[in-house]
């Protein structure tokens, strides 16, 4: 009987306060998170940002109990999914591979090899594809595969995105309906979908399908909710968790909350649409920061739809995904890891790869830029990184 | 039905080459591993040693495939033990808590709390108690419990050591017998028990029962082997993995190997007695370094008994331990974490706690000592740390 390994990929999160800095360093070291023209600056900048940013971030993790629950929840999801698949007669074992914290992808690959798995199904726990989430995880897995002959022998099938999965849509709709029904005036409640943002350039220049998938997904969910309840609620879709000076997908959730308050919304249901597990973005950013903004702007009843975690209908949807992936056409790791098109970094000036004039000019500019930033931050204790909200 | 959580404690090991340095830092930051008179020097010294030692250590991990298999094996042991306990009608879930690397004890505690466990059995995967292994893990768990009210509510029972466990002794004996039978002259083969060493002062000054338990354990195993085979093999017991300038338990394994070769031993069976999982000490130190010493000294047939890993008889022995712990008298975490007596650090001079003359004198001495070491190592690129084998 084929031994199937289901590799669940997610972001990872620090579980102890002292791990926050190293976690941030890993995150900002990824060129898919902060893009720089010369890779040589990646690690120093990652070190610099993570060092200066970690105390703020530590406070956020302190506020949710001292660490991220993501590993625990993801491992629970893995166990539940494994049981669901075995109940269907699929001899599956599930593994967890985090991108920026333990357990890392390397550990999962070692486990898969040791367990004599015949076929691997790669399932990112991001319903919507983005260069910076599923894309980064697929490419990490491909890097490990390139240098591991034993791993290369294994057949791999990938699930690239699954925002339209029936179980996922239905479980999101169910949880939203429960919150609507708990409102004083259910049909006057406003639904605020909030997704993790990405830089606008990812979508507009690099062709990241993320925004389209998020929009389609919100429509599918709202349609399901309306059909079930028999009435329509007003809704908005916005993006949260912006970092850095670049423009990200708009509207920003915090601005939408202010507008909704100003427009007289009294009962609000916030739906974290791109997160399937409770994490810092739901427990701290939405439940604490955004709630405060909402209440300050006149919203009285602030309700947040819980993340799916191990909601049985959702786990069943994941099992459907794995089952159809096994019987459907194979999507290779190369196809899944492929970027939509060449990412244009600086469209205003032609960029050339290699050690050439263009590179040297940019090298000088970036070095001066980073030097000035460091100078201000270190000497004056304030500067551009504080100004743009990175510190 | 009582939900039992079985907490398996072990050392932990880096799974990726880049994790070797941080792992060593964690290891040497533990005052149970390197004892200093003033805790303030602990972290700088840990940083210094781990930084300078990591490239040598990385090479060792490279030689065994790029990382430690300890997490993977320990999680396999956890799964097998869980199944064995459930087959006996005990509603058990097992958890892994590593002391110096991921998954850390904090993660296991979070999982235990989330799973609504009623009773925790703490089982160190060290058969023999030592201040620096089980002792350090018990105290780590106690520190976490002291600051966690939810965790304090949980009933905890500890297994302090289990070197005389029937399943453990029997499975060690079985594996040794297999190796003896594979020798050309089975009754002429020499058995070399090798245990992880500890500083002699732990045993002689602090009262660590480690050496006694190792000796008793070797006798139990050899007795079982003799009864089963019907003949006696010569055997020795020695200690490996010494680090630093201090005297450790003797004889040292490398010296014993030289002597055995000089005495004409041709077939040798090395038995890693204090390790229940394959790790750097078995796969690299014994299989590569000690094998080389043995072959260079005239030993022809060098055989190493495999670590127990998930050997069914061994897992069954662990299940016996958990079952009797649940029905037997309760050993609390405080009792398990207790040191045998106050550790005497510098018996040649009376040590007084607090900021007093004695502390200041030692402060000055240690600061000068560390400064001189750093100076030699950094400026000349060679010095005392190289000389004593730390680098």
Swiss-Prot record, chains A, B:
TM stretches of this protein: none
EC number per UniProt: 4.98.1.1
Biological pathway: Porphyrin-containing compound metabolism; protoheme biosynthesis; protoheme from protoporphyrin-IX: step 1/1
Alphabetical GO biological process terms: heme biosynthetic process
Coiled coil: none
Short name of any one Pfam family annotated for the protein: Ferrochelatase
A molecular function (GO) term: metal ion binding
Official protein name in the record: Ferrochelatase
């Amino acid at each position: 009987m084929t031994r199937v390994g289901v590799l669940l990929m997610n972001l990872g999160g620090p579980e102890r306060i002292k791990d926050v800095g190293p976690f941030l360093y890993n995150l900002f070291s990824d060129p898919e998170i902060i893009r720089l023209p010369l890779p040589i600056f990646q690690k120093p900048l990652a070190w610099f940002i993570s060092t200066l940013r970690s105390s703020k971030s530590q406070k956020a993790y302190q506020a949710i109990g001292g660490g991220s629950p993501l590993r625990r929840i993801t491992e629970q999801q893995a166990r539940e999914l494994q049981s669901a698949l075995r109940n269907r007669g699929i001899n599956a074992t599930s593994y967890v591979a985090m991108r920026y914290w333990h357990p890392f992808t390397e550990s999962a690959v070692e486990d898969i090899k040791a367990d004599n798995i015949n076929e691997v199904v790669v399932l990112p726990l991001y319903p919507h594809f983005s260069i910076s989430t599923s894309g980064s995880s697929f490419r990490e897995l491909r890097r490990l595969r390139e240098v591991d002959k034993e791993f290369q022998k294994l057949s791999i099938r990938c699930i690239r995105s699954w925002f339209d999965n029936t179980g996922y849509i239905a479980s999101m709709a169910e949880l939203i309906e429960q919150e609507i029904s708990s409102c004083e005036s259910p049909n006057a409640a406003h639904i605020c979908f909030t997704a993790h943002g990405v830089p606008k350039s990812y979508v507009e220049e690099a062709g990241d399908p993320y925004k389209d998938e998020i929009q389609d997904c919100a429509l599918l969910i709202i349609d399901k909710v309306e059909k079930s309840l028999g009435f329509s609620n007003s809704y908005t879709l916005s993006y949260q968790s912006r970092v850095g000076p670049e423009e990200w997908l708009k509207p920003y959730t915090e601005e939408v909350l202010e507008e909704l308050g100003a427009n007289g919304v009294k009962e609000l249901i916030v739906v974290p649409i791109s997160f399937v597990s409770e994490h810092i973005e739901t427990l701290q950013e939405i439940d604490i920061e955004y709630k405060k903004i909402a209440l300050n702007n006149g919203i009285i009843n602030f309700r947040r739809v819980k993340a799916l975690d191990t909601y049985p209908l959702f786990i069943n949807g994941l099992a459907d995904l794995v089952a159809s992936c096994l019987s459907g056409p194979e999507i290779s790791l190369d196809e899944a890891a492929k970027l939509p098109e060449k990412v244009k970094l600086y469209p205003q000036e032609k960029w050339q790869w290699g050690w050439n004039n263009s590179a040297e000019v940019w090298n000088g500019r970036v070095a001066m830029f980073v030097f000035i930033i460091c100078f201000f931050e270190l000497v004056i204790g304030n500067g551009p990184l504080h100004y743009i909200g990175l510190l």
